[in-house]
């Protein structure tokens, strides 16, 4: 077993909230492993997280980790008012030669009254996000747990879960 079955990462040492969930991992074209996680302790409530953790490893045992705390990083913008930054995931953008990080956001100021899916590129060393996040899509109802895959023909498919009313369910 990996690391002789011993824990590799302790969430209370890598996150501001001392807890993580929704891990997503992939291997990059450079051979490194990249992981993103929600920085959250569930017992504090569903609207209790304000960021994510970006991680990178050569061997899946030793990890570099960096928190992205939205109220601090995006002070003075709508992103400073997030009540949740949920289920971040990554995909490598071959054209840009960068990792795209995408996630759901909800704010408490009315500017994002339901979970919308946003995205931003990670910086070169996968320690932060570049620029302000942009809307990936707006389903006009809560959308969470997004996943993007590329098929063998180079076509991208987006899967997500909806949370609102009659539209509730998984979509492609």
Predicted regions span which residues?
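Beta-rich carbohydrate-recognition and catalytic domains
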Residues: 1-85, 91-172
């Amino acid at each position: 077993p990996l690391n002789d079955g011993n824990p590799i990462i302790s969430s209370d040492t890598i996150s501001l909230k001392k807890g993580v969930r929704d891990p997503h991992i992939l291997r990059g074209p450079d051979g490194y492993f990249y992981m993103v996680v929600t920085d959250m302790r569930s017992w504090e409530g569903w609207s209790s997280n304000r960021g994510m953790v970006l991680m990178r490893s050569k061997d899946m045992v030793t990890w570099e980790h960096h928190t992205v705390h939205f109220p601090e990083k995006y002070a003075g913008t709508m992103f400073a008012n997030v009540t949740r930054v949920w289920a971040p995931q990554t995909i490598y953008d071959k054209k840009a030669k960068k990792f795209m990080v995408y996630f759901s956001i909800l704010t408490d100021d009315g500017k994002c009254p339901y979970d919308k899916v946003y995205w931003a590129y990670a910086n070169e060393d996968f320690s932060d996000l570049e620029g302000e996040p942009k809307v990936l899509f707006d389903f006009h109802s809560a959308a969470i747990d997004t996943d993007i895959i590329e098929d063998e023909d180079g076509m991208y498919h987006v899967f997500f879960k909806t949370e609102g009313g009659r539209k509730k369910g998984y979509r492609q």
